[in-house]
UniProtKB/Swiss-Prot annotation:
GO process annotations (BP): chlorophyll biosynthetic process; dimethylallyl diphosphate biosynthetic process; flower development; isoprenoid biosynthetic process; photosynthesis
Main localization (coarse): plastid
GO cellular component: chloroplast; cytosol; mitochondrion
Pathway listed: Isoprenoid biosynthesis; dimethylallyl diphosphate biosynthesis; dimethylallyl diphosphate from isopentenyl diphosphate: step 1/1; Porphyrin-containing compound metabolism; chlorophyll biosynthesis
Protein residues bound to Mg(2+): H92, H104, E199, E201
Gene (name only): IPP2
Catalytic residues (positions): C139, E201
Record protein name field: Isopentenyl-diphosphate Delta-isomerase II, chloroplastic
Source organism per UniProt: Arabidopsis thaliana (Mouse-ear cress)
Root EC class: isomerase
Length: 284
């Protein structure tokens, strides 16, 4: 039975989802931080000892392999201060996470349509970490580049979110302007995926309400689905019961358990700005 049969709801498959009108934007403000130049910070790759030719990774999907070695994640300390950069590959090796305490900056996008339904994705089966788990709209990393290191009002992270929504879901930049993302908070968590890979992230939680056209990239996304609040609760129950092998990503589950329902209230009321807390880093 396919993963889609786990839902007693219509499934949005990998085709265009045409929705036209845009929704009202949310403004936000929080403590400004200074920008950082990528030239000033160390590259930690010399300390990792990982080679791209590692035969143990010969079976890795070609697209995912390229991203693992080409993408440079932003290394931070537990106060979210940038301390360097390293490859996506090195940042997700559990041996580096445990031995070197490598922590990288990340973001999680929660996109709602004008009916206040949340767009979820099931990660592709070729993903290196957490394949085929269901998660929020888009989860990725700002890269070690000038446009994504801008810290004032989390602009670098918002730029990265716009980039990855196009990469993963085919959502064009015009449909998700960077000014309409509302960063609500940050959380720090660690989660192993298997014996080799895992996550150790300082995750920015970004909310946006827009009606968008979705064209998922099969290299990144297996399926997508909009869910209401009640439908999400049923999904969580199925995951807890282990029905049909359904799994949720650990970061998504942390947000669901700690923040999502109260923030969903603000989505429906149009009061997201009242929920913003970018001073606290929640260690979960």
């Amino acid at each position: 039975m396919s993963a889609s049969s786990l839902f007693n709801l219509p499934l949005i498959r990998l085709r265009s989802l045409a929705l036209s009108s845009s929704f009202s934007s949310f403004r936000f403000a929080h403590r400004p931080l200074s920008s950082i130049s990528p030239r000033k910070l160390p590259n930690f790759r010399a300390f990792s000892g990982t080679a791209m030719t590692d035969t143990k990774d010969a079976g890795m999907d070609a697209v995912q392999r390229r991203l693992m070695f080409e993408d440079e994640c932003i290394l931070v300390d537990e106060t979210d201060r940038v301390v360097g950069h390293d490859s996506k590959y090195n940042c997700h090796l559990m041996e580096n996470i445990e031995a070197k305490n490598l922590l990288h900056r990340a973001f999680s996008v929660f996109l709602f349509n004008s009916k206040y339904e949340l767009l979820l994705q099931q990660r592709s089966n070729t993903k290196v970490t957490f394949p085929l788990v269901w998660t929020n709209t888009c989860c990725s990393h700002p890269l070690y580049r000038e446009s994504e290191l801008i810290q004032d009002n989390a602009l670098g992270v918002r730029n990265a979110a716009q980039r990855k929504l196009l990469d993963e879901l085919g959502i064009v930049a015009e449909d998700v302007p960077v000014d309409e993302f509302t960063p609500l908070g940050r959380m720090l968590y660690k989660a192993p995926s298997d014996g080799k890979w895992g996550e150790h992230e300082l995750d920015y939680l970004l909310f946006i309400v827009r009606d968008v056209k979705v064209q998922p990239n099969p290299d990144e996304v297996a399926e997508i689905k909009y869910v209401s609040r009640e439908e999400l609760k049923e999904l969580v129950k199925k995951a807890d019961a282990g029905e049909e092998g359904l799994k949720l990503s650990p970061w998504f589950r942390l947000v669901v358990d700690n923040f999502l329902m109260k923030w969903w209230d603000h989505v429906e009321k149009g009061t997201l700005v009242e929920a913003i807390d970018m001073k606290t880093i929640h260690k979960l």
